[in-house]
Curated annotation (Swiss-Prot):
Annotated Pfam families: NFACT-R_1
GO molecular function: DNA binding
Bias (Polar residues): 184-198
Gene this protein is translated from: ccdc25
GO annotations of cellular component type: endomembrane system; plasma membrane
TM ranges: 105-121
GO BP: any one term: positive regulation of cell motility
Membrane-side (Extracellular) residue stretches: 1-104
Coiled coil recorded as keyword: yes
UniProt feature coiled coil, ranges: 112-189
Official protein name in the record: Coiled-coil domain-containing protein 25
Major localisation: membrane
Record flagged with keyword Protein biosynthesis: no
Amino acid sequence: MVFYFTSAVVSPPHTIYMGKDKYENEDLIKYGWPEDIWFHVDKLSSAHVYLRMPKGTTIDDIPKEVLIDCVQLVKNNSIQGCKMNNINIVYTPWSNLKKTADMDIGQIGFHRQKEVKIVAVEKKINEIVNRLEKTKEERYPDLAAEKESRDREERNEKKAQIQEQKKKEKEEVKKKKEMEDLKNYTSLMKSDNMTTNEDGYDSDDFM
């Protein structure tokens, strides 16, 4: 089971999701998308919360209002963190999550520590948590199938882009050749005209 929330504080709305337990977190880690941003309470146990960003955006493009929604949701889903003030939330792109065979279920590391960001959360804001909870949906998605569908769509888009680029290049080559042919034809016509003038007769005295 995966819990989905909608952050509608900006337009278009953003999807936030998290697993029910550490076992589902394993699948979320495995089948995350490049557009996903992972959130967790720093140094405390908490839910693994993911924010799905629009394609073509990065972690630096997260709207401030959406970021606040995410960290409040993470804090609220930490047994210890929800009762504490002044905690830190870490977040990083899904692609930066590292999972090795010797790690426990639900445990992760990072490929590059410099890509991990930290935001301080002073206290729980009930209005935000309640608003998000009203959008909560329980689903049983086929994460592997969704990931494959997403990747297939991306491959098709890249294939179409490559084909379009090749088409443009072919048209440019054709246009360049046509310009060269026109240039050569013009030069030839000019040369023929000059030859005709040089061979002409100016006198009417002829036999």
